[in-house]
Every structure is written in C-alpha cells, then in structure tokens.
Amino acid sequence: GLGKTFISIQKDELRQAMIDLINHLVVMNLYKVPPERILLLTPHCLQENTCIHKVTHDVYNCKQCGRCQVGGLLKIAKEYGCQFIVVTGGTLARMKVKEAKPKAIIAIACERDLASGMADVFPIPVIGVLNERPNGPCCNTTVDINKVRDAVELLIDKDNYERNC
C-alpha cells in the first residue's frame, strides 16, 4: 500500500544522502591515486541483456558495439589505465575488490547496492555513481558516462600518468 511506497522512497532518499556524503568526503580529501590503482566497478545489468559477449569474467570480451555502455566504460578504463571489473552481485564485488587491492573505487550501481557496498569497502575511498533504470531494476541499466569520467579525473594522480588516447 501507500505506507510501503513511502518507506521505500524514504530508504532510497536516505541511501542517496549517504552516497552523496561519502562522495563529498572523498572529493574533499583530494586523493591522488595512480590510475592502475583505481577500480571501475560496475554491475552486469549495464550490459545489454541479449549480448552474447559476456563481460563478467573478462571485460575485454566487449566488442564496444555501442548497444550498451560497457564499451564506453571500457574506453575510459583503457584511456586512463584504470582497472575495470563487471560483477554479477555484491558478494562477487567484495571478492574482486579484495583481489584488485585498489586505492580508490568508482562504483556504479543502484542506491541499495551502492550504499551497502560503499560501507563494506570502508576505508577505501569510493565515488558512487547511480545507474539509471529505464527498464526497471537489474535489466539494461544505463549510466551517465560523463559522471564516470569526472570521477576518474577527480581521483587520478594527474602528475604521474600519460593518457592513452
């Protein structure tokens, strides 16, 4: 009923406030991270669900065809020299973070997954970028590529890297 809708809206607003606060604190700290120690972490729902080139085991399987935004994110990762991992869920995300040992993370997800994930990896600095869900949750989601690029630009140690254009 109405009460349930109100509570879920409040929860997402609360999560959004937490994400905004953590993003703000990360930005205020002026981190300078070598690009290879920045992890771009995204959910597999960003990939077009009919695509046969699965990117969850190897993001370089992406053919950058333009049907979804995985290709655009891969371009950013290659351009700056960041790590880029696509995961199927929170448990795998936490495991991949442990393996990758990043000094900073740019995470793309919905409010719920971002809020819990940002808390789970503390004290690693995370910039959270909300995905957009035009087809509902967990299916063919999108993200503002410019927000992701801006996050990389904020975290990267500009004095010590060559851009791979």
Language model regions located:
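Proline-aspartate-enriched helix->loop->beta-strand connector
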Residues: K101-K103
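Short His-Asn-centered micro-motif
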Residues: L41-P43, I85-G90, I106-C110
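Short, well-ordered alpha-helical microsegments
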Residues: V70, A93-M95, D113-S116
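A short, gly/pro- and small-residue-rich
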Residues: Y60-C62, G117-P134
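Ser/Thr/Gly-rich flexible loops in soluble cytosolic domains mediating phosphotransfer, phosphorylation
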Residues: I127-C165
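Short amphipathic alpha-helical segments
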Residues: H53-K54, K98, G117-D120
